């Protein structure tokens, strides 16, 4: 936002417009005439979810490779182009998306679009860059393997959505990355970076019609293709996995259950439940496990929600001798949320927390740009700030309890533990709630 006064004057008004190019590329913009920046993003429906077996990690690998040079820009030119105007250029890969995005002053929007178009449409993907980038990615995989929380997360997710793309690592594995070839990379780019699989969003001081014209000039030559096949809804599993690593000082614990998809109509009561359980310093997990019992430094709950499924999980790191006590404490909180309504005070705090987080999350052009993509891809409609705030305010205590009762079922709880476990055992009876 341009200033605090502007936030007060235009709290919930969003000037959002949509367009679709003849080849199928979707464009969504939000005009914010009271700012001087523009954030622009190109979103590809890729990630581990759409990768075939040997391709695991290829979305992320390709995201790296496009920065090695394009038809009209070297790797150094790409870096200098945005740096020289004080802007930022970034990219990331998730389970369901790849994003290339930039933020610049409004007068540099043509430059920003030109760079993103080059990255997406004209990467060189040279064979000589392949081996070097494999080395980079393999080191990234090794780095992640040295982080217990990451190892635990991958262990949990790979078993929770076993056999499905959502359960595969975004980076791929050492085995898959080593086998990536030049033809595989080019074929994947041609198949996945297709018009029906591309969304472009922008927010800031921009003119919608002019930007659509500019995007058309850059992307109109990309031929339409058949949409990618939609994969199946993943089946969830509830294993109990204890993975020994004697070199660790702590035992790391993740417990999780299936949750709603991102656009589910009951997502707001679910957000409240997550906030009450482990969404902050005043949450039950933080207060009871850290503050009252002193069993953990890090303890929280989180939601990982996707287009057709989700996971509601709890993480804690604790000493080996208190690991089972932490598991019991988490189960106790599950049980309490099922048996008793949350207090009016908890409900009020959770609502205010969500409202504040929502308002703060939409202050910048970059966050607005990302929000446009999220709403277009997952909700297929645009909700006003008032819509979202009112949805939060409408949540009742019995709705939160009903979700706890539906989700926190003993037979559905998956568990993964990593650390100095000795002869520790955890059975399904330990998870009765």
Region roles according to the model:
Residues 53, 57, 111, 132, ...:
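A generic structural signal for residues located within well-ordered alpha-helices
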Residues 4, 14, 20, 31, ...:
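Charge-rich, well-structured scaffold segments of protease-associated domains
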Residues 240:
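Flexible, small-/acidic-enriched active-site or ligand-binding loops
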Residues 1-10:
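N-terminal amphipathic/basic-hydrophobic helices that include classical n-h-c signal peptides
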């Amino acid at each position: 936002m341009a200033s605090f006064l502007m936030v007060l004057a235009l709290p919930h008004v969003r000037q959002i417009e949509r367009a679709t190019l003849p080849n199928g590329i979707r464009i969504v913009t939000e005009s914010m005439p009271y700012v001087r920046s523009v954030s622009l993003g190109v979103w590809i429906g890729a990630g581990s979810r759409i990768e075939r077996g040997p391709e695991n990690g290829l979305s992320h690998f390709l995201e790296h490779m496009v920065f090695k040079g394009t038809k009209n820009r070297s790797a150094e030119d790409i870096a200098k182009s945005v740096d020289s105007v004080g802007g930022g250029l970034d990219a990331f890969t998730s389970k369901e998306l790849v994003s290339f995005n930039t933020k610049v002053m409004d007068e540099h929007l043509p430059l920003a679009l030109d760079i993103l178009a080059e990255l997406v449409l004209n990467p060189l993907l040279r064979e000589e860059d392949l081996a070097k980038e494999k080395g980079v990615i393999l080191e990234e995989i090794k780095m992640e393997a040295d982080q217990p929380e990451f190892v635990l997360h991958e262990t949990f997710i790979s078993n929770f959505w076993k056999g499905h793309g959502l359960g595969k690592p975004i980076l791929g594995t050492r085995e898959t990355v080593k086998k990536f070839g030049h033809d595989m990379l080019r074929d994947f780019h041609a198949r996945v970076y297709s018009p029906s699989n591309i969304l472009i969003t922008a927010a800031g001081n921009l003119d919608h019609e002019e930007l659509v014209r500019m995007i058309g000039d850059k992307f109109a030559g990309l031929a339409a293709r058949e949409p990618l096949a939609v994969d199946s809804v993943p089946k969830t599993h509830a294993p109990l996995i204890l993975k020994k690593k004697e070199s660790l000082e702590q035992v790391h614990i993740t417990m999780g259950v299936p949750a709603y998809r991102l656009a589910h109509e009951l997502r707001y009561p679910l957000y409240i439940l997550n906030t009450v359980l482990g969404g902050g310093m005043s949450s039950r997990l933080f207060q009871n496990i850290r503050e009252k019992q002193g069993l953990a430094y890090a303890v929280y709950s989180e939601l990982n929600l996707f287009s057709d499924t989700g996971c509601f999980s709890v993480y804690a790191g604790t000493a080996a001798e208190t690991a089972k006590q932490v598991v019991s404490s988490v189960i106790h909180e599950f049980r309490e949320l099922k048996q008793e309504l949350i207090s009016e005070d908890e409900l009020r705090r959770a609502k205010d927390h969500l409202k504040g987080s929502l308002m703060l999350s939409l202050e910048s052009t970059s966050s607005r740009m990302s929000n446009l993509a999220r709403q277009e891809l997952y909700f297929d409609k645009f909700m006003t700030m008032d819509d979202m705030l009112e949805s939060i305010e409408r949540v009742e205590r019995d709705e939160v309890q009903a979700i706890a009762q539906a989700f926190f079922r003993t037979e559905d709880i998956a568990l993964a533990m990593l650390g100095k476990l000795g002869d520790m055992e955890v059975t399904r009876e330990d998870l009765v709630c």
